[in-house]
């Protein structure tokens, strides 16, 4: 995923190439297109057509090509399993333990619950997280927190996610972190979200609470930065 995010961050630079030599530009485009076609035929899993993914996401075809190259570089087979996903994700958080949060994040990406994440799964989630509406991002976050996928978030699920995030950030990010800080954080947020006090947070309660409380929204945006 490191290569994927790296290539994505450089998209704007690549898109601003000077167009002084049209013939050279056309040659480069045709060469890249041939390379893309060859790449598509050499992997074990061939993703959906880029036109279809372009229609389903907020990325252009060219951006999808760049993202695909990065994904294939990290995952030559065209899919990534949980163990590989954890190894890649751990590289971004060397001072903490990212394994538990990576497990939850992997399950959120693996929408079909097959035990592997395809390029389509990855780019669809990335599209929501980077360019989705506030509503789309909140729905995706709710699904992440709903660990057992029963349509609700209970306090222990929220606690598991928040603690995993604190563990991942490590001691250098939180030098004076007390052991009960995650629990206190969850207690405050859950009390605000569980509006009818039935011990669970529904999607509607989650959406309403997040959009009406700036503190919750800021915290979620902070947590989304580690996705």
From Swiss-Prot:
Organism ancestry: Eukaryota, Metazoa, Chordata, Craniata, Vertebrata
Annotated residues for binding of Ca(2+) 1: 146, 148, 150, 152, 157
One cellular-component annotation, GO: Kv4.3-KChIP1 channel complex
Family note: Belongs to the recoverin family.
GO MF term list: calcium ion binding; potassium channel activity; potassium channel regulator activity; protein-containing complex binding; transmembrane transporter binding
Superkingdom of the source species: Eukaryota
Oligomeric and partner information: Component of heteromultimeric potassium channels. Identified in potassium channel complexes containing KCND1, KCND2, KCND3, KCNIP1, KCNIP2, KCNIP3, KCNIP4, DPP6 and DPP10. Part of a heterooctamer composed of the tetrameric channel and four KCNIP1 chains. Probably part of a complex consisting of KCNIP1, KCNIP2 isoform 3 and KCND2. Self-associates to form homodimers and homotetramers. Interacts with KCNIP2 isoform 3 in a calcium-dependent manner.
One Pfam match: EF-hand_8
Annotated compartments: Cell membrane; Cytoplasm; Cell projection, Dendrite
Name of this protein: A-type potassium channel modulatory protein KCNIP1
Membrane topology field: Peripheral membrane protein
Any one Gene Ontology BP term: regulation of potassium ion transmembrane transport
UniProt domain EF-hand: residue ranges: 38-94, 97-132, 133-168, 181-216
Transmembrane feature ranges: none
Region (Interaction with KCND2): 214-227
Function: Regulatory subunit of Kv4/D (Shal)-type voltage-gated rapidly inactivating A-type potassium channels. Regulates channel density, inactivation kinetics and rate of recovery from inactivation in a calcium-dependent and isoform-specific manner. Modulates KCND2/Kv4.2 currents. In vitro, modulates KCND1/Kv4.1 currents. Increases the presence of KCND2 at the cell surface.
UniProt KW keywords: Calcium, Cell membrane, Cell projection, Cytoplasm, Ion channel, Ion transport, Membrane, Metal-binding, Potassium, Potassium channel, Potassium transport, Repeat, Transport, Voltage-gated channel
UniProt main location, coarse: membrane
PROSITE patterns: EF_HAND_1, EF_HAND_2
